[in-house]
Amino acid sequence: MLPPAHLARLTTLVATLLAGAGGAWADVGGTVSLQTDARERGMSYSANRPSAQLGLAWDGDAGWYAGAQLAHARFSQHRGAAVLLYGGRVIELTPGLDGEAGLVAHAYENVSSYDYQEVYVGLLGERWNLRAYLSPDYYGIGQRSLYAEFNLRWPLMKGVAAVGHVGLLHGWGGQVSPYADSRNATRMDVRLGASWQLGAGSDLQLAWTAAGRGGPYTWMDATRRRTVVLGLTVAF
């Protein structure tokens, strides 16, 4: 299990955000996801193998939200739970356009040196979103990082949508790993595919995903760079 000190620190990050929501009424929901390859920012954290994820989400009044995700991560020498906690707030900027800001914390069982936190800001449209994440110590490697992403979901017909994603990860400062690609401090990842709605609360997605080289070096760099991922998500 994760050390109590790490759990307490991560929980405090979310609790700080929720304090402003007071006793407001909230909606709580969850999801269960199965994927042929669990990927984050184009890189596999399941060693190119199938994986399952459990998610819980809280939506409160005044745009406050928080949640948690539990998954299984495979490292070169270790494996264990991967926990993600997040919290933030959405505010309306103009009709059809919202802004958001929040915190996200990542923790890994048995390899706490990989734990890291990020702050993020974003713009949310009806069919798209744009976010930027900033970390002072990406994956505990001693480098600062900035990750920017654009996500699009475009309806094609009833129950079917095209999905797309492009992200850029840039690292700087600290000591660069000797395993990193010193020619480029930035890495791009893309995902293109389609999504099918299978009844209320169920979604099937098939997508091609790819990641370039460069950027901050992490334990995921040895994984396959291009693959096709099939995933099923069920909400409850």
Task: Show which residues each predicted segment covers.
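Repeated loop/turn-to-beta-strand initiation elements of outer-membrane beta-barrel proteins
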Residues: 28-30, 62-66, 95-101, 127-132, ...
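Residues that define the transmembrane beta-barrel architecture of outer-membrane proteins
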Residues: 48-52, 79-83, 113-119, 124, ...
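Detector for outer-membrane/organellar transmembrane beta-barrel domains
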Residues: 116-182
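Transmembrane beta-barrel domains of outer membrane proteins
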Residues: 31-33, 55-59, 88-90, 122-124, ...
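Short glycine/proline- and aromatic-enriched beta-strand/turn motifs that initiate or cap beta-hairpins
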Residues: 25-74, 160, 167-168
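Transmembrane beta-strands of outer-membrane beta-barrel pores
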Residues: 34-40, 70-74, 91, 105-109, ...
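Outer-membrane beta-barrel "beta-signal"
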Residues: 126, 192-198, 202, 222-236
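Cleavable N-terminal export/targeting peptides
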Residues: 1-29
